[in-house]
Amino acid sequence: MANSLVEKYSNEIAPAMNKKFNYDSVMEIPKIDKIVLNMGVGDAVSNAKNLDEAVEELTLISGQKPLITKAKKSIANFRLREGMSIGAKVTLRGDRMYDFLYKLINVSLPRVRDFRGISSRSFDGRGNYTLGIKEQLIFPEIDYDKVNRVRGLDVVIVTTAKTDEEARELLTEFGMPFAK
C-alpha cells in the first residue's frame, strides 16, 4: 500500500505538480513530511483508565506506540494540575505515514456517516492540513464491541508546501476527497 502511494507520488504527482507550478528545482516540489494523530482525553483527569484505552486505540489505528501528552499549566476550573497526563499523540513518517494515508483515504473516510467530502478550508496558511475525526469507529482496526466511549481525534498532515493552494493540489492528487 505505502509503496503504491510512493510510486504514485514519484511517477505521477511530482511531475504534475512541477508542470502546474513551474518549480525551479525538483526539491521545491511539495511532499508530505509527516502525519500527526492527536487524541485529547479530557476525562483522564478523573479516570486514568480512559487514557489507557485512548492509548490502546491510537496504537491500533497508527501501528505505533503513542506519546502521552501532559498539561502545560494548571487550570482550576477543569481540576487540572500542571504535568497531569491529558492525551496521546503519534507522529507518523515514512512507510507508516503512507500506510495510514492510504487507509484514511480509501477505507476510513468513506465509512463516515453522511460523508460528502472533507472541508477544503482547514489549511493553516503554511501548507498543512488539519482534519478532525468525530469518532474512532471509522477505522477498521477498532472493534465496535470493545469501545466503551466514542472519542475523536485530530489528524494533521504536514507538507513541505509553501502555500495552501500547493498543499491542496498535492492532497487532491493523492486522492483526498475534498467537498466540491
Curated annotation (Swiss-Prot):
Reported function: This is one of the proteins that bind and probably mediate the attachment of the 5S RNA into the large ribosomal subunit, where it forms part of the central protuberance. In the 70S ribosome it contacts protein S13 of the 30S subunit (bridge B1b), connecting the 2 subunits; this bridge is implicated in subunit movement. Contacts the P site tRNA; the 5S rRNA and some of its associated proteins might help stabilize positioning of ribosome-bound tRNAs.
Protein name per Swiss-Prot or TrEMBL: Large ribosomal subunit protein uL5
GO CC annotation terms, alphabetical: ribonucleoprotein complex; ribosome
Annotated PANTHER family: 60S RIBOSOMAL PROTEIN L11-RELATED (PTHR11994)
Record SUPFAM superfamilies: RL5-like
A single GO molecular function term of this UniProt record: structural constituent of ribosome
One annotated GO biological process: translation
Pfam families in UniProt: Ribosomal_L5 (PF00281), Ribosomal_L5_C (PF00673)
Family listed: Belongs to the universal ribosomal protein uL5 family.
InterPro entries, alphabetized: Ribosomal_uL5 (IPR002132), Ribosomal_uL5_bac-type (IPR020930), Ribosomal_uL5_C (IPR031309), Ribosomal_uL5_CS (IPR020929), Ribosomal_uL5_dom_sf (IPR022803), Ribosomal_uL5_N (IPR031310)
Source species of the chain: Lactobacillus johnsonii (strain CNCM I-12250 / La1 / NCC 533)
Keywords on record: Ribonucleoprotein, Ribosomal protein, RNA-binding, rRNA-binding, tRNA-binding
Subunit details: Part of the 50S ribosomal subunit; part of the 5S rRNA/L5/L18/L25 subcomplex. Contacts the 5S rRNA and the P site tRNA. Forms a bridge to the 30S subunit in the 70S ribosome.
Domain of life: Bacteria
